[in-house]
Structures are given as C-alpha cells and as structure tokens.
Design a protein with these regions (language model features):
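Short glycine-rich or small-residue beta-strand-to-loop segments that form or flank ligand, phosphate
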Residues: 15-21, 48-50, 74-81, 107-109
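Conserved phosphate/oxyanion-binding catalytic-loop motifs
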Residues: 74-101
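N-terminal glycine-rich anion-binding loop in soluble enzyme alpha/beta folds
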Residues: 2-62
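Conserved small/polar residues in nucleotide/adenosyl-binding loops
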Residues: 113-115
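Short, well-structured alpha-helical segments in soluble
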Residues: 61-69
Length: 115
C-alpha cells in the first residue's frame, strides 16, 4: 500500500536512505532493493539513497538527486541496525557539511534500533 501525503504550500520534502556501503555487490544490491521498495511506498515524496563508504552512489549523490527534483527539506534515515560511530558521527558530518554548503535543510532520523 502506498502512502500519499500532499501538503500545499509546504517545502517539498524528500527522503534519503543512508547506508554504510559494502564491497560485496550482493549487499549493495539488497540495499538498493530497500530504496526501491520505499520509493514505491512513499509516492508523495522523492526518495533516494547513498552510501557512506565502499559503494556508489555516495550520500552526496543522493542529496544532489533530491535537490535536482526540487526538494527543499530532506529526512535522512540511517538504515543501520545500531547507532554506532558511523550513524552517530560520520553520516551526520556528511549531512551537516552538505547542508552548510548548499543551504538544503536536512533532518536526521533515528537508527533502526529505535524503531
């Protein structure tokens, strides 16, 4: 079932799924499948994804894709089981730097352990 939300006169929101990345191609493909599934469910929002390391696209690529679609505010969701160093420090650092450089508003969500 798709979730369709329309909010008139609100900034255009998008969703960025943040992954760690892997050198294992099958792991990367599984993560890409997660992003595709979310795109199908969140039909009212542009959805993209990126990896912190070891795989493409990187987080900045996903953010650029969302900006190119007119997104003004991003909800970045770490798709990690635990809020370890990457989820607590590295991903927020990339997001904060990108936001400071471009002015894009980015809210950072909780790791999957909190759900």
């Amino acid at each position: 079932m798709a979730l369709q939300i329309d909010v008139p006169d609100a900034p255009k929101h998008g969703v960025l799924i943040c992954g760690h990345g892997s050198r294992n191609r099958l792991a990367v493909e599984e993560f890409e499948g997660l992003a595709v599934g979310l795109k199908q469910r969140l039909t009212g929002f542009p959805v993209d994804y990126g990896f912190l390391e070891f795989a493409q696209p990187i987080l900045r690529d996903g953010l650029e894709n969302l900006r190119a679609q007119g997104v003004e505010k991003v909800l970045a969701i770490p798709a990690m089981l635990f809020a370890a160093g990457h989820a607590k420090n590295d991903i927020p650092s990339v997001l904060n730097t990108y936001s400071a450089e471009t002015g894009l508003k980015i809210e950072y969500g909780l790791s999957l352990i909190h759900i």
